[in-house]
């Protein structure tokens, strides 16, 4: 019978799938530092896409908005509503920060599924979505932490630190720990979801024909958008919380 050859082929296929490598990096040596080139290249591409789209859409504003201008006005209104809901009436100065976070993460996530990164060959590793790398997500989370510390200190001065002993000094260790868990949860949630989504697509493409993974890719686009929304919402909520001084 053909049972043994079929079993051997199945095991060989599983072995090939297990050979999918994660973690190879391409570095630039600048001075005495190693720069993670993959993340920089893909981040520059995402930034170029965002800037180019905005410039093309609003370079000649019309009283009656064109399709592109209308789209970006809708996006701006969405970000303003999100910021106002989470931060409150003093949301205005934070709209650019929240908008930048949301748009960069959104386009980065979608670029992993829509842009043919693998066409560009590197000496080591391969290009992928910027948010597929823990360095990017940690940097975004640390920026968010710096933003809500700045918001609290600029709004309340040194009395901002009184929140650590409210409502009782017993909660001091927990309140301090919370400042570490916030960026950790932000960074690992985003990194884990985007990495898992791309790995699932890679494995499915290795297992089955191209048509079958397409529904999973569409689901990945949806979840990628949701992750950008979650990150921006939490960032705005943390900023609003630090300005109001309650948990």
Curated annotation (Swiss-Prot):
Pfam families according to UniProt: ATP-synt_A
Keyword Thylakoid part of the UniProt annotation: yes
A GO cellular component entry from the record: proton-transporting ATP synthase complex
Database matches in InterPro entries: ATP_syn_F0_a_bact/chloroplast (IPR045082), ATP_synth_F0_asu (IPR000568), ATP_synth_F0_asu_AS (IPR023011), F0_ATP_A_sf (IPR035908)
Locations listed in the record: Plastid, Chloroplast thylakoid membrane
SUPFAM superfamilies given in the database record: F1F0 ATP synthase subunit A
Main location: plastid
Residue stretches spanning the membrane: 38-58, 95-115, 134-154, 199-219, 220-240
UniProt topology in membrane: Multi-pass membrane protein
UniProt xrefs under HAMAP family: ATP_synth_a_bact
Similarity annotation: Belongs to the ATPase A chain family.
Subunit-structure text: F-type ATPases have 2 components, CF(1) - the catalytic core - and CF(0) - the membrane proton channel. CF(1) has five subunits: alpha(3), beta(3), gamma(1), delta(1), epsilon(1). CF(0) has four main subunits: a, b, b' and c.
Protein name (database record): ATP synthase subunit a, chloroplastic
Source organism of this protein record: Oryza nivara
Gene name linked to the record: atpI
């Amino acid at each position: 019978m053909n049972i043994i050859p079929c079993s051997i082929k199945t095991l060989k296929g599983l072995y090939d799938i297990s050979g999918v490598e994660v973690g190879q990096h391409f570095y630039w040596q600048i001075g005495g530092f190693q720069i993670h080139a993959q993340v920089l290249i893909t981040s520059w591409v995402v930034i170029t896409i965002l800037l180019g789209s905005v410039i093309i859409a609003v370079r000649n504003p019309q009283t009656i908005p064109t399709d592109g201008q209308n789209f970006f006005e809708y996006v701006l209104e969405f970000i303003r509503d999100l910021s106002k809901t989470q931060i409150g009436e003093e949301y205005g100065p934070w709209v650019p920060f929240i908008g930048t976070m949301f748009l960069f993460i959104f386009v980065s996530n979608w670029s992993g599924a829509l842009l043919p990164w693998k066409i560009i060959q590197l000496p080591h590793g391969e290009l992928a979505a910027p948010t597929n790398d823990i360095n990017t997500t940690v940097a975004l989370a640390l920026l968010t932490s710096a933003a809500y510390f700045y918001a609290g200190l600029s709004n309340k001065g040194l009395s901002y630190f009184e929140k650590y002993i409210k409502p009782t000094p017993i909660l001091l260790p927990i309140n301090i720990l919370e400042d570490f868990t916030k960026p950790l949860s932000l960074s690992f949630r985003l990194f884990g979801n985007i990495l898992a989504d791309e790995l699932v697509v890679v494995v499915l493409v290795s297992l089955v024909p191209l048509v079958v993974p397409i529904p999973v890719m569409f689901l990945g686009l949806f979840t990628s958008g949701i992750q950008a929304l979650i990150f921006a919402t939490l960032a705005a909520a943390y900023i609003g919380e630090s300005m109001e001084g309650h948990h």
